[in-house]
């Protein structure tokens, strides 16, 4: 087999591939063995029709497509290895010649991984993040704990305020007509949560138990129910009960209920401070890592093929679909609720997809430029770490991974980011 690579404009080129006649004939033979198993001919058992009779009745050309399906993937794979190129999309194949006892000649128009011209990636100036924890930070965290342990109690006197929960009946009307899904009874609405459409909750504020009111709102233009989107509506609302949060007292008893590992409020505050310090340090490290990677990516020159962005978009949509399934939802339901579709979703994700592809290409280029390698011991240590994290045997982790090659590549990327951080200004 012979292969010749000719670079065209941008990241596109043409592979001209020639395969020996012997391999062509072998592929035709293999195609016959496959096809003949499906043919019933009177006088012969299924799959036992002689080759000469087959060619006489159907013509040898009837085998060519199956033969091509056999020979093309192998020939194309060997050709890209020989040419030393890295395709990022399916090729456009053009068969110039295919027949028995003759060399196969075909071309493959290929989009390849782009060349990355690295810019500055050492000595990058990154902003130092403040990691000091103040007394105010601790008090705010304590207040959040207090809020989470608050109990809802009935407010006997007074009106609905922001932060209260109002138990209401409601029924919505558009153009004087009730609409599907617009009615509820004894619904607990947390005021200020933004659960209902904009403007609704604010108009419930100030009502007393037993009072009713017509709430005038407009559905958002992007509302998931197209027949309601952008339309004004009137909701008849009656407040049955008002509940307010009753905060527990901040004392040693509260501290023990919040965290059984502490005995006093002071111990709880000290633990909260330690947790906040660790959290801020972790957050600062992540921010620096993200920043150096983004700076290095921005400094590089790359002509990214659209095919790579499309592939990344498909991957992102699959990831999004998996997250939805964990919440008991699927893409079709999501499209209905949000009034969007597959094209709009991809358009929303496109900028992030471009960013991901650029960053991945730049990190790969840095790995190559700095000869970053990963040892077998480092891969083994990572597998053991994963086993401990998931509470699984090491062998089970290895079996789940199948191959550790992808893990080794991930570790190289991590090392590349470490390199950028260590060499930042």
From Swiss-Prot:
- Explain the purpose of this protein: Involved in protein export. Acts as a chaperone by maintaining the newly synthesized protein in an open conformation. Functions as a peptidyl-prolyl cis-trans isomerase.
Matches recorded under InterPro entries: PPIase_dom_sf (IPR046357), PPIase_FKBP_dom (IPR001179), Trig_fac (IPR005215), Trigger_fac_C (IPR008880), Trigger_fac_C_sf (IPR037041), Trigger_fac_ribosome-bd_bac (IPR008881), Trigger_fac_ribosome-bd_sf (IPR036611), Trigger_fact/SurA_dom_sf (IPR027304)
What does the entry's free-text domain comment contain?
Consists of 3 domains; the N-terminus binds the ribosome, the middle domain has PPIase activity, while the C-terminus has intrinsic chaperone activity on its own.
Segments forming domain PPIase FKBP-type:
163-248
Places the protein is found: Cytoplasm
In terms of domain of life, where is this protein from?
A: Bacteria
Q: Which EC class is the enzyme in?
A: isomerase
Q: Which family is annotated?
A: Belongs to the FKBP-type PPIase family. Tig subfamily.
Q: Name one GO biological process term.
A: protein transport
Keywords attached to this Swiss-Prot or TrEMBL record, sorted alphabetically, are: Cell cycle, Cell division, Chaperone, Cytoplasm, Isomerase, Rotamase
What would be the name of the gene that encodes this protein? tig
Write the Enzyme Commission number(s) for this entry: 5.2.1.8
Q: Does the keyword Aminoacyl-tRNA synthetase apply?
A: no
Q: What's its catalytic activity?
A: [protein]-peptidylproline (omega=180) = [protein]-peptidylproline (omega=0)
Q: Does the keyword Cell cycle apply?
A: yes
Protein's organism: Bacillus anthracis
MF terms in GO: peptidyl-prolyl cis-trans isomerase activity; protein folding chaperone; ribosome binding
Under which name does UniProt file this protein? Trigger factor
For this UniProt entry, what's an example GO CC term? cytoplasm
The record's PANTHER family line, in alphabetical order, gives: TRIGGER FACTOR CHAPERONE AND PEPTIDYL-PROLYL CIS/TRANS ISOMERASE, TRIGGER FACTOR-LIKE PROTEIN TIG, CHLOROPLASTIC
């Amino acid at each position: 087999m012979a292969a010749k690579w000719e670079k065209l404009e941008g990241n596109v080129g043409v592979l001209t591939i020639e395969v020996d006649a012997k391999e062509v004939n072998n592929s035709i033979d293999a195609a016959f063995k496959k096809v003949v198993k499906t043919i019933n001919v009177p006088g012969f058992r299924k799959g036992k029709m002689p080759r000469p009779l087959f060619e006489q009745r159907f013509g040898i050309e009837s085998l060519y497509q199956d033969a091509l399906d056999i020979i093309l993937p192998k020939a194309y794979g060997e050709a890209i290895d020989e040419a030393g190129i890295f395709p990022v999309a399916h090729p456009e194949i053009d068969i110039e010649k295919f027949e028995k006892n003759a060399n196969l000649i075909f071309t493959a128009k290929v989009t390849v991984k782009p060349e990355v011209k690295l810019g500055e990636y050492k000595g990058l100036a990154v902003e130092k993040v403040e990691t000091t924890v103040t007394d105010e930070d601790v008090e705010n965290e304590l207040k959040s704990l207090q809020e989470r342990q608050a109990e809802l109690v009935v407010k006997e006197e007074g009106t609905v305020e922001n932060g209260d929960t109002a138990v209401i009946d409601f029924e919505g009307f558009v153009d004087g007509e009730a609409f599907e899904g617009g009615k509820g009874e004894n619904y607990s609405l947390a005021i200020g949560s933004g659960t209902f459409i904009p403007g609704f909750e604010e108009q419930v504020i100030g009502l007393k138990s037993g009072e009713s009111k017509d709430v005038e709102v407009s559905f958002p233009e992007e509302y998931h129910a197209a027949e309601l989107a952008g339309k004004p509506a009137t909701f008849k609302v009656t407040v049955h009960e008002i509940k307010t949060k009753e905060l527990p007292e901040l004392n040693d008893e509260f501290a023990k209920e919040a965290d059984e590992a502490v005995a006093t409020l002071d111990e709880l505050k000290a633990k909260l401070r330690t947790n906040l310090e660790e959290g801020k340090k972790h957050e600062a490290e992540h921010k620096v890592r993200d920043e150096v990677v983004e700076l290095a990516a921005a400094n590089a020159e790359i002509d990214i093929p659209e095919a790579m962005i499309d592939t990344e978009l498909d991957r992102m949509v699959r990831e999004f679909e998996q997250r939805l399934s964990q919440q008991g939802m699927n893409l079709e339901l999501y499209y209905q609720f949000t009034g969007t579709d597959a094209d709009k979703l991809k358009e929303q994700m496109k900028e992030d997809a471009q960013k991901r592809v650029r960053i991945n290409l730049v990190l790969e280029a840095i790995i190559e430029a700095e000869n970053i390698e990963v040892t077998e011991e480092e891969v083994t240590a990572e597998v053991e770490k994963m086993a401990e994290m998931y509470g699984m045997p090491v062998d089970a982790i290895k079996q789940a991974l199948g191959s550790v090659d992808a893990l080794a590549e991930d570790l190289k990327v991590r090392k590349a980011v470490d390199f950028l951080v260590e060499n930042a200004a």
